[in-house]
Swiss-Prot record:
Presequence boundaries: 1-33
InterPro entries according to UniProt: Metalloenz_LuxS/M16, MPP/UQCRC_Complex, Pept_M16_N, Pept_M16_Zn_BS, Peptidase_M16_C
Family annotation (Pfam families): Peptidase_M16, Peptidase_M16_C
Official protein name in the record: Mitochondrial-processing peptidase subunit alpha
Modified residues (N6-acetyllysine): K298
Length: 524
């Protein structure tokens, strides 16, 4: 027992000696309070004897240019170098729901769900994911009204594997009966989810496009209609793919890669490859130009029980009012983007903060003044041949008429005097949002791909910022006044008992003050 106590005491003494020694060299000389080594030196002055720090300079210019090469088969290869060991590479295709006029609506929706399934070289989606996993990669496919995008983010060292895989996924999908049946179920579930979701924004966006461009181009269904789910099969998909998945309608875009290496991979895997639907022959591409019609789409629905949790959500009626703006190829696109930011808006219970837009018009004039308004948000959708600026508002069904009048007044005010302070705030917020978004590699990839797909080149961020800075109050007034001369598009969802007629909404937007015409009832 005595031996054990003696050994423990010796061990503790040894530990104390070890702890007393400095772990890394000699202890630093530090003094505090009045005995400081550098007395009376304010924090704003550099310490004597300390090397001056060298800070990075910011000139607002991109360090790497966007390079574009067009191959012999018409495929465009675009790249933007970026620091880091990871890259984002993908294929963007000029296809989407706007090109389905001669087909069943919903093909693009099906292709989005079928992406990265079995191909000529890969037996299943799991095999594709395992291949990407070796390079730390993930994949995704998104379709919109005018673009389909297949993208992979992975280690830059695996660029060859990634481009090879993308080529196989895009050009050689198997589209087995089992996969198509699973896709039918996935589409059905997504449609059910859209109708049950408390946030109606995706559904309203679909409705406002249908109202604005009735049965043409961007007004065609973005989501597959229920009646078409069972009708879409491999033959229909191959017919669509043959016409729209051609090299001249594609861009291979990459961020964080060397341009020459990406071009080499494109030539190796995407030139001369025969797709699964056969050799390309005569194609039948829909080149229709969007025709804005205006109009109204109404969906009567009981919104009193959409809560998915224990906290009840109040019954609301949702209205979206829109007017035709311009395409992203026009010079007026930038003033419209600034106008949209100036309108801003959001939800009535959204937490504020710097850059949140709490001084935008829809907050100051609508949400702050009318406590019963639950939402007022401005959206701007722009395409290669048209655009749509709209305001989404939500309120209790009993106050629908008043809500619509408030929105029509805000549209009228767009064409009136623009305050310089609010304009500068909107321009600054738009530029900061642009630059912050472009700090993300996948966002840069999408920006490069979409711009090159539409214009064969890319405007760099500092060029866009210059255009934003040059927007004047008269530009906002001019584009707003031109927009207000068109017919409105209206989408309404919920209890629509007190919804004004389309003719009354159109009259309010044509008036000087935005007031709805009085409605008279013989019986109350």
């Amino acid at each position: 027992m005595a031996t054990a106590v003696w050994a423990a005491a010796r061990l503790l003494r040894g530990s104390a000696v070890l702890c007393a020694r400095p772990r890394f060299g000699s202890p630093a000389h530090r003094r505090f309070s009045s005995g400081a080594t550098y007395p009376n030196i304010p924090l704003s002055s550099p310490l004597p004897g300390v090397p001056k720090p060298i800070f990075a300079t910011v000139d607002g210019q991109e360090k790497f240019e966007t390079k574009v090469t067009t191959l012999d088969n018409g495929l465009r290869v675009a790249s933007q170098n970026k620091f880091g060991q990871f890259c984002t590479v993908g294929i963007l295709i000029n296809s989407g729901s706007r090109y389905e006029a001669k087909y069943l609506s919903g093909i693009a929706h099906f292709l989005e769900k079928l992406a990265f399934s079995s191909t000529a070289r890969f037996d299943s989606k799991d095999e594709i994911l395992l291949t990407l996993e070796k390079h730390g990669g993930i994949c995704d496919c998104q379709t919109s009204r005018d673009t389909t995008m297949y993208a992979v983010s992975a280690d830059s060292k695996g660029l060859d594997t990634v481009v090879d895989l993308l080529a196989d996924v895009v050009l050689h999908p198997r589209l087995t009966d089992e996969e198509i049946e699973m896709t039918r179920m996935a589409v059905q579930f997504e449609l059910e989810d859209l109708n049950m979701r408390p946030d109606p924004e995706p559904l309203l966006t679909e409705m406002i496009h249908e109202a604005a461009f009735r049965e043409n181009t961007v007004g065609l269904h973005r989501f597959c209609p229920v009646e078409n789910i069972a009708k879409i099969d491999r033959e229909v998909l191959h017919s669509y793919l043959k016409n729209y998945y051609t090299p001249d309608r594609m861009v291979l875009a990459g961020v964080g890669v060397e341009h020459e290496h990406l071009v080499e991979c494109a030539r190796k895997y995407l030139v001369g490859a025969e797709p699964a639907w056969g050799a390309p022959g005569t194609v039948d591409v829909d080149r229709s130009v969007a025709q804005y019609t205006g109009g109204i789409i109404k969906v009567e629905r009981d919104m009193s029980n959409v809560s998915l949790g224990p906290t009840p959500i109040p019954e609301l009626t949702h209205i979206m009012v829109g007017l035709e703006s311009c395409s992203f190829l026009e010079d007026d696109f930038i003033p419209f983007a600034v106008l949209n930011m100036m309108m801003g808006g959001g939800g009535s219970f959204s937490a504020g903060g710097p850059g949140k837009g709490m001084f935008s018009r829809l907050y100051l004039n609508v949400l702050n003044r009318h406590h019963w308004m639950y939402n007022a948000t401005s959206y701007h959708h722009s395409y290669e041949d048209t655009g749509l600026l709209c305001i989404h508002a939500s309120a209790d069904p009993r106050q629908v008429r008043e809500m619509v009048e408030i929105i029509t007044k805000e549209f009228i005010l767009m064409g009136r005097t623009v305050d310089l302070v609010e304009l500068e705030r909107a321009k600054t917020q738009l530029m900061s949002m642009l630059m912050m978004n472009l700090e993300s590699r996948p966002v840069i990839f999408e920006d490069v791909g979409r711009q090159v797909l539409a214009t064969h080149s890319r405007k760099l961020p500092h060029e866009l910022c210059t255009l934003i800075r040059n927007v004047k109050p008269e530009d906002i007034k001019r584009v707003a006044s031109k927009m207000l001369r068109g017919k409105p598009a209206v989408a309404a969802l919920g209890d629509l008992t007190d919804l004004p007629t389309y003719e009354h909404i159109q009259a309010a937007l044509s008036s000087r003050n935005g007031h709805l015409p009085r409605s008279y009832r013989l019986f109350r």
